[in-house]
Amino acid sequence: MLPPPKSAAVQIVRPPSPSSEKAKEKEKKHSPEKRETAQRICRNVMIYGYCKYQDQGCIYYHPPAGADPSTPQNSSPVAHAPTPSAPTPLAGTPAREKPTLSIEHLAAPVFVPKGLDSSPRASTPSVPTPSAPTPPVWPSLPSTGLLPRQDVQVSAQPSHAQLSATASPMAYDDPSHIALSAAHAHAQAQALTHGILDPHAHAPPVDQSMYLPPRQPLDYNLYAAPLPSIGGNPLYPTHPHAFFVSDDLRRAIQAKQEAVYAGANGASAPGLPQELGVYHSLIPLPLPAPTAQCPPTQSQPSKVYGLPSPVYRATSEVDGNTYCLRRVEGFKLVNQLAFASMDTWRRMRHPNIVGLKEAFTTKTFGDNSLIMVYDYHPLSTTLYDEYLSPNPPEPSPASALANQPPKRRSSPPERILWSYVTQIANALKAIHSSGLAVRNLDASKILLTGKNRIRLNGCGVWDVLAFDNKTPVQAFQQEDLLSFGKLIISLTCDFFQPTLPFSLPLEHISRHYSSDLSNLILYLISKPAQGQIKSIDEVVKMMGPRILNELDAVQSYADVLENELGAEVENGRIVRLLTKLGFINERAEFELDPRWSDTGDRYILKLFRDYVFHSVGVDGKPILDLSHVLVCLNKLDAGLDERVMLVSRDDQSCLVVSYREIKHCIEAAFNELKNAGNNHRVHR
């Protein structure tokens, strides 16, 4: 009678050598009578249902088809444990009776051909579902989630039908799928014995060659094609400059950045206070000419406000940004409620309105002055200076003798005029919706901050200067619409004067402009009917189709800017290249290492550095040519096949290599340095 085992699970291990005494004792312990090796059942048959090496010289016993594999020939009876019934096998699998599996059969060895170097290990069969389809040819990784309850058959040992139904032929043909660790097989045996499956104890992943390789990083030295809306435009040529930011946009951005710090030397202009609250470095705008005779503190009265209102540029100590300070001289505060609307103006952020930051009074200039702080837009001009200001008289004797009045600038085209009208109406819509009014809609107070981009300036000044809490705000909004109509007439008619009637300008507009513009102007300047008021909403409805044209222009310009930005996304490629060269060349810790110093790739990179940065002219003076450096580094980054001759410092040897080969040298040397590097090394 066999002694009771310590555990219900039996560890599947490599069968010991027959010459070992330990193997003999173990065989006597588990079997009452010794059997021949030829009568020992192959463990592949007991576990998988068949043996793929049966016709290849397997020395163990393989029962015929239809016979019970648990009953080999000339074997003595061994106690078997009853096994519950297994699920129905898949189609194509020969049906077998309810087999049983003994402990002795689990200890049977596995036949492995001599050509396989790996140790014989059993693969882990998966538990099938009763209605599982035929396993696909492509093996899938086992799921790590919990198995359904109906998929787990609580039994002491799995049946042969279960093991054979889930066996994938492809998995058995590959030795990597057969070979599992002994620990993994032991864990699976324990799980099957106790009726518990560990969903996380799955087989190793399949061969990595069966999957797609990981995605390689992009080659940032290759320039992508422009956007479809830009590339298909015949007005956008594909010349070499199209790969970089356009010259016009670069000049405009650089000019605005220079204008922010123009004339700023850390101090205010002469005659101005060094500090004004939290603002310093006050510079008058526009910058006075060098030949100006009057000091910057003297200014003429404003035609809009009636008081001198000079403008300064200053820097804030709070955030370091630059702001525009409008000073109204001789201001007398009558009512403290005059600043009540400033909170609403500060909260208003609109693309067509110059933002107001704060407003306060001061005596720093020697008088009572009102200071209005706005956002600063460098290199801005006004619609008055752009279209309405008279041109300087031509220096000709004929014009002087004729005493001809100066001619104003030409009127804007209707397409641009509609763009201005749309933006002004957009700003008025936001202001009137907030319960405010502009009250100073004049051409001199409308900034042109970019190409056809306008912003209303000086908002909120009249709310403080002419504070009137008795007049309803709707009356001021009606004045805004009337001023809007007069502004459009002044931009379209050369001869318009505010004192003249509107009949002549309207006749001129009807002949030279569209009827939509004439109807819009007529609505703005006409008096509403009795009991009705004009509204900016009606203005927006009248110009509805024109708004779509403005929307098209805005989106097209956004595509242009996005395309320009795409050309500068990887503008740090040269810096990364220089960084790698700096890491590689002349490392102090490798000075005594003959394998690193002046040999192989490092020597080529050393000569290339001398060629790029240490060139000397005929006169022996160093050549400081930035264009030469950029051209060489860009060719190196692109890996061109162009060849360059590198000469040693003693002029005794030279190498002719291509930029592609130099780039490969950089990558090889940098990878070697990275693999041998120590992140905890302290620089000497």
Swiss-Prot record:
Residues where ATP binds: R326, D375, Y376, H377, P378, L379, S380, T381, T382, S444, K445
Biased composition (Pro residues): 127-139
Compartment annotation: Cytoplasm
Stretches for region Knob domain: 584-684
Biased composition (Basic and acidic residues): 21-38
GO molecular function: ATP binding; poly(A) binding; protein kinase activity; zinc ion binding
Assigned keywords, A-Z: ATP-binding, Coiled coil, Cytoplasm, Metal-binding, mRNA processing, Nucleotide-binding, Zinc, Zinc-finger
Entry GO CC: P-body; PAN complex
InterPro entries in alphabetical order: Kinase-like_dom_sf, PAN3, Pan3_PK, Prot_kinase_dom, Znf_CCCH
Coiled-coil region list: 545-583
GO biological process entries: mRNA processing; nuclear-transcribed mRNA poly(A) tail shortening
Family matches, as Pfam families: Pan3_PK (PF18101)
SUPFAM superfamilies the UniProt entry points to: Protein kinase-like (PK-like)
Main localization of the protein described in the UniProt heading: cytoplasm
Region (Pseudokinase domain): 263-544
ZnF (C3H1-type) intervals: 36-65
Region (Disordered): 1-38, 68-97, 112-146, 387-412
Assigned protein family: Belongs to the protein kinase superfamily. PAN3 family.
Quaternary organization: Homodimer. Forms a heterotrimer with a catalytic subunit PAN2 to form the poly(A)-nuclease (PAN) deadenylation complex. Interacts (via PAM-2 motif) with poly(A)-binding protein PAB1 (via PABC domain), conferring substrate specificity of the enzyme complex.
Domain-related comment: The N-terminal zinc finger binds to poly(A) RNA. Contains a pseudokinase domain. The protein kinase domain is predicted to be catalytically inactive because some of the residues important for catalytic activity are substituted and it lacks the equivalent of the binding site for a peptide substrate. However, it has retained an ATP-binding site and ATP-binding is required for mRNA degradation, stimulating the activity of the PAN2 nuclease in vitro.
Protein function: Regulatory subunit of the poly(A)-nuclease (PAN) deadenylation complex, one of two cytoplasmic mRNA deadenylases involved in mRNA turnover. PAN specifically shortens poly(A) tails of RNA and the activity is stimulated by poly(A)-binding protein PAB1. PAN deadenylation is followed by rapid degradation of the shortened mRNA tails by the CCR4-NOT complex. Deadenylated mRNAs are then degraded by two alternative mechanisms, namely exosome-mediated 3'-5' exonucleolytic degradation, or deadenylation-dependent mRNA decaping and subsequent 5'-3' exonucleolytic degradation by XRN1.
Protein's name in the database: PAN2-PAN3 deadenylation complex subunit PAN3
Record organism: Cryptococcus neoformans var. neoformans serotype D (strain JEC21 / ATCC MYA-565)
Gene this chain is encoded by: PAN3
